[in-house]
């Protein structure tokens, strides 16, 4: 079964200029083998229906497409059980031990060690370890786009970026949900990225993933004989260096330094990269690049953990 990206046929017509009408674009997509249009019928809408009714388009093409959709539904048992599982049944599957083990294995095997000059693995004899970066004290940064956390926090996004959905930049209707109780929306300094450094987003994390520990919490749990010096240091985007001095002081005091680097994957105005959030520059954020250079002059072992994005 071949399914379009959200707004894919509309994009082909409006941006790529394929087809004289949206119906013709839909016909060309169906002829090429696309069975379903998402998220709603536009190319596969009234104009394409009229092409089939009038005989302008061969109904055999429609029959083949409908057949593939029906076959997929029969294979999945959707005619016998057309509704989603109830809460308890769904929860039972989500909490299966085998699934958790596979998820952990996948996470471990997806990590890439780019370079190691003998710093790793960390010695148990480290007295002071500096942990610096915006990802270290927030477990949300472990979760990428389209995870439950990402989608729930996007409800509070000041602007949507999901292609093909009302409220997206393409629709010209930017500006939707705001924080509850009239709370102002805060942004990463000097950027249009909405900050998630608010209690509301911590509550979402605790609600959905109550046992998920941050990097800081995990290090404290595992390195009980080491003093962990945590400092925020710099944001996930932009040029802000206002917290550098406190972080550099931690670098000077520490035996080893861990820097969390990269942006925040997600969607809408809540992320630096993800669904509909593009970047023209693949380098590290300017503030992070500047901090690495500033920290390197002290000659301490620096470990960079790149979380996501640039």
Predicted regions and their residues:
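Catalytic-core region of carbohydrate-active enzymes that cleave or remodel glycosidic bonds
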Residues: 1, 16-32, 67
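Short, well-structured alpha-helical segments that form the helix of a local strand-helix-strand
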Residues: 26-27, 61-70, 104
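Conserved, charged catalytic cores of large soluble enzymes
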Residues: 45-46, 67, 71-92
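Residue-level detector of short coil/turn "hinge" positions at structural boundaries
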Residues: 36, 58-59, 80
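C-terminal non-catalytic regions of proteins with extracellular/luminal or membrane-system context
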Residues: 3-6, 10-13, 18-19, 44-59, ...
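Mobile "lid/hinge" segments at catalytic clefts and subdomain interfaces of large enzymes
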Residues: 30-40, 44
């Amino acid at each position: 079964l071949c399914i379009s990206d959200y707004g894919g046929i509309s994009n082909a017509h409006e941006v790529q200029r394929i087809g004289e009408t949206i119906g013709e674009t839909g016909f060309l997509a169906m002829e090429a083998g696309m069975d379903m249009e998402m998220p709603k019928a536009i190319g596969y809408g009234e104009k394409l229906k009229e092409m089939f009714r009038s005989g302008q388009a061969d109904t055999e093409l429609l029959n083949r497409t409908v057949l593939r959709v029906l076959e997929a539904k029969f294979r999945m048992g959707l005619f016998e059980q057309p509704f989603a599982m109830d809460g308890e049944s769904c929860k039972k599957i989500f909490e299966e031990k085998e699934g958790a083990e596979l998820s952990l294995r996948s996470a471990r095997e997806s990590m890439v060690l780019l370079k190691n000059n003998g710093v790793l693995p960390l010695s148990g004899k480290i007295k002071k370890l500096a942990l610096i970066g915006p990802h270290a004290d927030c477990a949300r940064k472990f979760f990428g786009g389209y995870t439950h956390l990402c989608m729930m926090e996007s409800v509070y996004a000041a602007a949507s970026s999901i292609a093909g959905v009302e409220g997206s930049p393409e629709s010209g209707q930017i500006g939707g949900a705001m924080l509850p109780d009239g709370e102002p929306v805060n942004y990463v300094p000097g950027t249009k990225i909405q900050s998630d450094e608010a209690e509301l987003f911590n509550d979402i994390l605790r609600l959905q993933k109550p046992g998920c520990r941050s990097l800081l919490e995990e290090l404290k749990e595992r390195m009980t004989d080491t003093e962990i010096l945590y400092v925020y240091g710099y944001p996930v985007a932009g040029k802000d260096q206002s917290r550098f001095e406190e972080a550099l002081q931690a670098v000077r005091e520490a035996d080893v330094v861990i820097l969390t680097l990269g942006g925040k994957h997600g969607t809408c105005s809540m992320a630096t990269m993800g669904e509909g959030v593009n970047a023209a520059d693949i380098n590290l954020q300017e503030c992070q690049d500047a901090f690495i250079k500033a920290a390197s002059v002290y000659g301490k072992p620096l470990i960079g953990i790149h979380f996501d994005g640039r």
